[in-house]
């Protein structure tokens, strides 16, 4: 399971022109589910993301996590993250989870986040328009 996290001052996702989720300070989490992923991996990744120290303390060092700054998360499914890009000029998607499994684990991950802090979501498998202001920019690839 892969999370591409971006520290944002604001982020929003729209489906068919309607806002389905938006946050101010926090993390935009683009979530990719791989074939071998399960609930244990989803929980481990959620714990890692929510405790990953990407926010600055009073000394300007990245020592605080999203929970410590009372931030929010916006979770957006991103089936392209597990793509195989090693050869050619077209990505392969055989490493991605089956859509039914991917949706179940996306929902599970998002539900776990909701238990910890303010969480907004995109809509699984929808054509989404994601807007954000990346603060930094600060972006990290986390994988379990």
Curated annotation (Swiss-Prot):
Broad class of where this protein is predominantly found: cytoplasm
Domain of life where this protein originates: Bacteria
Pfam families to which the protein is assigned, alphabetical: Tyr_Deacylase
Stored SUPFAM superfamilies: DTD-like
Entry-linked CDD domains: Dtyr_deacylase
Compartments reported by the entry: Cytoplasm
Domain remark from Swiss-Prot or TrEMBL: A Gly-cisPro motif from one monomer fits into the active site of the other monomer to allow specific chiral rejection of L-amino acids.
Origin species: Aliivibrio fischeri (strain ATCC 700601 / ES114) (Vibrio fischeri)
Residues spanned by motif Gly-cisPro motif, important for rejection of L-amino acids: 136-137
UniProt entry tagged with the keyword Hydrolase: yes
Stated role: An aminoacyl-tRNA editing enzyme that deacylates mischarged D-aminoacyl-tRNAs. Also deacylates mischarged glycyl-tRNA(Ala), protecting cells against glycine mischarging by AlaRS. Acts via tRNA-based rather than protein-based catalysis; rejects L-amino acids rather than detecting D-amino acids in the active site. By recycling D-aminoacyl-tRNA to D-amino acids and free tRNA molecules, this enzyme counteracts the toxicity associated with the formation of D-aminoacyl-tRNA entities in vivo and helps enforce protein L-homochirality.
Entry GO CC: cytoplasm
Gene Ontology MF term list: D-tyrosyl-tRNA(Tyr) deacylase activity; Gly-tRNA(Ala) deacylase activity; Ser(Gly)-tRNA(Ala) hydrolase activity; tRNA binding
Entries under InterPro entries matching the protein: Daa-tRNA_deacyls_DTD, DTD-like_sf
The name this protein goes by in its record: D-aminoacyl-tRNA deacylase
């Amino acid at each position: 399971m892969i999370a591409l996290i971006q520290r944002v001052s604001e982020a929003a996702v729209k489906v068919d022109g309607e806002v389905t989720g938006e946050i101010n300070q926090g993390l935009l989490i683009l979530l990719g589910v791989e074939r071998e992923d399960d609930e244990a991996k989803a929980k481990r990744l959620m714990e890692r993301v929510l405790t990953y120290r990407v926010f600055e303390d009073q000394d300007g060092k990245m020592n605080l996590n999203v929970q410590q700054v009372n931030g929010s998360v916006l979770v957006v499914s991103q089936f392209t993250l597990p793509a195989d890009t090693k050869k050619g000029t077209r990505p392969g998607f055989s490493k991605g989870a089956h859509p039914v499994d991917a949706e179940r684990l996306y929902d599970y991950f998002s539900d776990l986040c909701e238990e910890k802090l303010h969480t907004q979501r995109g809509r699984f498998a929808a054509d989404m328009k994601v807007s954000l202001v990346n603060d930094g920019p600060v972006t990290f690839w986390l994988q379990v």
